[in-house]
Amino acid sequence: MSRGFGVTAGLDPEIASPLAARCQELGYSSMWSNDHPGASGLETLAEYAKGADRVDLGVAVIALDRQSPEQIASEVDRLGLDRDRLWLGLGAGFTEKPLTTMREALPGIREALPGIRLVLAAMGPKMSALGGAEWDGVFFNWMIPEFAAQAREWVEQGARDAGREPPPVFGYARTAVGTDAEGRLAEDESFYRDMHQGYRSHFERQAAPEGTVGVAAENAGDAQEELSRYRGLDTVVVRALASATFEDMGALARALTTTVSRAR
């Protein structure tokens, strides 16, 4: 299991670039950003690339109801992103038929974005199986370790049904360390729990108490132990719940580093 490091899109470039350099030095395999209406995940990846020349760069995820594949391709080119380093996470957003949308969109996405590894955002068994059958990777958000293991089985079953090797499985593990860790995790989680029916069903499926879907620990040792339980993931992405400063982000990255291998 390799380890990536992730932040929220729009992180100050003066922080993002040196943070990526620090994470590369520490042995992280990849740097990740989400994408949201207020900030571009691809722009955050471009800042990472200025500071780190070896780690993979991933965005998880861009919603196809907000950006078309052609728009994404244009941004990749404008920003000068190296396609060989990219993991491009894509999701259905608020479309009415997400499974159909992502199944039917894939050929056009591949045509618009050649040479880029495409990662499907999934929550339930059907989307997970689709990712296993047709995509280059599958990405999960907000999960307990037991769900990660179950999700991996769904992905692998989809791959078996399609007669192919299973693609890598990625996931964000929201992680806070310190005396206020539980509060920070609960606050971030509460925003997503009622965002839309997909997330409501996702949290209900896991049946985990509110404020516990992720890692909240008083010290780095306990956090490391919790992260090690996400064995269902090929790459666990530490989604940092820390102040948006280089000092705090860098300290968390250092505390949670481990020996990793490139996710290829």
Q: What residue ranges belong to the model's regions?
A:
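Short acidic active-site motifs
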Residues: 15, 43-44, 126-127, 180, ...
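Acidic (Asp/Glu)-rich catalytic clusters
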Residues: 18-25, 45-56, 73-86, 113, ...
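Hydrophobic faces of well-ordered beta-strands that scaffold small-molecule active sites
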Residues: 3-9, 29-33, 55-61, 86-90, ...
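An alpha-helical appendage that flanks or caps ligand/catalytic pockets
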Residues: 92-114, 149-249, 258-264
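Residue-level preference for nonpolar/small residues embedded in alpha-helices
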Residues: 15, 40, 71, 101, ...
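N-terminal beta1-alpha1-beta2 module of alpha/beta enzyme domains
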Residues: 1-54, 60, 116, 249, ...
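Short hydrophobic interaction/assembly module
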Residues: 53-71
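Flexible, glycine-rich active-site loops centered on histidine and acidic residues
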Residues: 2-9, 65-119, 126-154, 184-196, ...
